[in-house]
Amino acid sequence: MATSMLGSVRGPRPFGLANLFHRQPPRDAWERVRRLPGPSAVRRSVAAASGPGIPGSHLYCLELLRKRDYESYLCSLLFPAECQRSASALRAFNVELAQVKDSVSEKTIGLMRMQFWKKAVEDMYCDNPPHQPVAIELWKAVKKHNLTKRWLMRIIDEREKNLDDKAYRSMQELENYAENTQGSLLYLTLEVLGVKDLHADHAASHIGKAQGIVTCLRATPYHSSRRQVFLPMDVCVQHGVSQEDFLRRNQDKNVRDVVYDIASQAHLHLKHARSFHRSVPAEAFPAFLQTVSLEDYLKKIQRVDFDIFHPSLQQKNMLLPLSLYIQSWRKRY
């Protein structure tokens, strides 16, 4: 039997995730969601937009998000109008760094790209950003919100260390990586929203860890197709599972137990972040809209009994825009 912080269970293993809908959404909710910019509108705007720096740099970021991080793209559209541009710049910056590892054939090239971004961030704080769309938009966000350079550099440093194709040695190591990347990104997002609050920071830390864990799980089928496994080794050893089991897409119970334990840890971080939501300023809630997609994935993997390779886990949730809008309207996370 799988044993995690949720305890031993038999048969279907419920997380006990809270129901998303406690109140009736506004009657025109779907109409409002339909008015969000669609892919074609973004592409037309990219071609037509102009502004200081590089013409269309903001909409370049939106298009990058739409293609590479659709959930963040949707979330950025639900930020307060005065924060949308900066929020999308931060997320586009994260995408630029995240795709380095998968887009280079040699670690040396990856290190060179990370060095470019380190210098770019240093130059932003000297009002001399490189002529690159994401860098231009990030520079504007830095100037507008006085963003903390330490968080930006910490994301780059952690992504750089992660260029090695090695599995996480432990769950703690995965959580540290998530805190230094996703957590730092959320701290910056709170700065964009003008939120300075210890409870909000505490929630950001737990949600960032949940995001990192879920991202690791979601990417496992892709990584296994490239003969790579990054799931925490200590959890695998505990259940007698080898990397080869994941490469062969083994669906034995002990493999599912590994996935269950890892998913349980993400659920616990979400649960803890939500346990003190009444102490978090409502102004911080847009930063935490991603909890909708995290909860959606955890529910889906629970329904397939933690079969991480089940085809349904790779399908887009067509109701995600509506769910995000309702969560935004409810001012909950």
From Swiss-Prot:
Gene Ontology BP terms: biosynthetic process; mitochondrial respiratory chain complex I assembly
Residue range of the transit peptide in the UniProt record, numbered on this chain: 1-44
GO cellular component, one term: mitochondrion
One Pfam match: SQS_PSY
Residue ranges that the Swiss-Prot or TrEMBL entry lists as coiled coil: none
Annotated keywords: Membrane, Mitochondrion, Mitochondrion inner membrane, Transit peptide
Family annotation (InterPro entries): Isoprenoid_synthase_dom_sf (IPR008949), Squ/phyt_synthse (IPR002060)
Compartment(s) where it occurs, according to its Swiss-Prot or TrEMBL record: Mitochondrion inner membrane
Its job: Involved in the assembly of mitochondrial NADH:ubiquinone oxidoreductase complex (complex I) at early stages. May play a role in the biogenesis of complex I subunit MT-ND1.
PANTHER family per UniProt: NADH DEHYDROGENASE (UBIQUINONE) COMPLEX I, ASSEMBLY FACTOR 6 (PTHR21181:SF13), PTHR21181
Family of the protein in this entry: Belongs to the NDUFAF6 family.
Name of this chain's protein: NADH dehydrogenase (ubiquinone) complex I, assembly factor 6
Organism from which the protein derives: Mus musculus (Mouse)
Phylogenetic lineage: Eukaryota, Metazoa, Chordata, Craniata, Vertebrata
